[in-house]
């Protein structure tokens, strides 16, 4: 199965190992991976900030860069959710609408692709430790993913997965929300960290590094013992 890799800005600039680990898992699943070096942002930051004209230019490039791809897979429910749910609105009454619809149907978040397309949940991973899982807003509400990451984590040998209270509550990041409303954003992250600590977990795992970056920063500020890991890093462990 041919897969085009989409590496979001956060991953590309700050957490490149997540992308490499995603490739490692996809190749073990039997996929042939290709990567377009010309790819850039999906356009979500500009769109969310209200700059629809600028966003449209970036999104048009995205459509061109990934045109013809059999499957597009990304380690970010946030970016995937944006392409799936908002590209068709952005390109309504546009010559690019058809391509936007096709792209929306071909792009998948990493766990969604593994479980629902490849129908594989066990990659022989092993990771000794206690962890709790954070449902990102984009994964839960835009990509409709709940059970998929947990199915994958349940097959990781040595990993004890413990659910925290209010697991579906936002971590407070929300892109520019964290900048515009910092006190609220930090308070939401503190609540998430408190719930995670109550499970006695050592790690918080999620599909989205943007959430994890925010949680990690707040956890360090609180001198919490909690560490964060992307799902791809866990699935690529131990083999």
Residue map of PLM features:
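Iron-sulfur cluster-binding electron-transfer modules in prokaryotic oxidoreductases
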Residues: 1-239
